A protein has these predicted regions:
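Short loop->beta-strand "edge-of-pocket" segments that line small-molecule binding or catalytic clefts
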Residues: 10-13, 40-41, 81
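Short, well-structured N-terminal submotif of metal-dependent ribonuclease cores
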Residues: 1-13, 23-36, 105-106
Length: 106
């Protein structure tokens, strides 16, 4: 199922996700190449009015950390499924569809 998702859609990430990926301290040279290729192939959602307002709503209602709230807001504002290994922080958000890629085949 995960490969179907990956192969069927262009990846989309929040600007926060891009920053987090590029700040990975232990990334090898190969990791950096893969990360840069992934980012190049992705739509990177910048902060805009819609994402800003949704972030404020999420922060107030669910008390998420700002980066997680921006990531969730980016997915919601663009009607995307959030793919993350950090499901616990996101599964309480109303209308946000969350998939843990490491649990798809379990």
């Amino acid at each position: 199922m995960m490969s179907d998702i990956i192969n069927s859609y262009q990846p989309a990430i929040s600007i926060i996700t891009e920053i987090e990926l590029l700040c990975w301290k232990t990334a090898t040279e190969n990791d950096v190449v893969v990360i840069n290729d992934f980012i190049s192939d992705s739509v990177v959602y910048q902060l805009n009015q819609s994402i800003k307002l949704k972030t404020i709503e999420i922060r107030k209602k669910y008390r998420l950390k700002l980066p997680d709230a921006i990531i969730a807001a980016s997915a919601l504002a663009n009607n995307h499924i959030l793919i993350t290994n950090n499901v616990a922080d996101f599964d309480k958000i109303y209308k946000l569809k969350v998939i843990d890629p490491f649990r798809l085949n379990k």
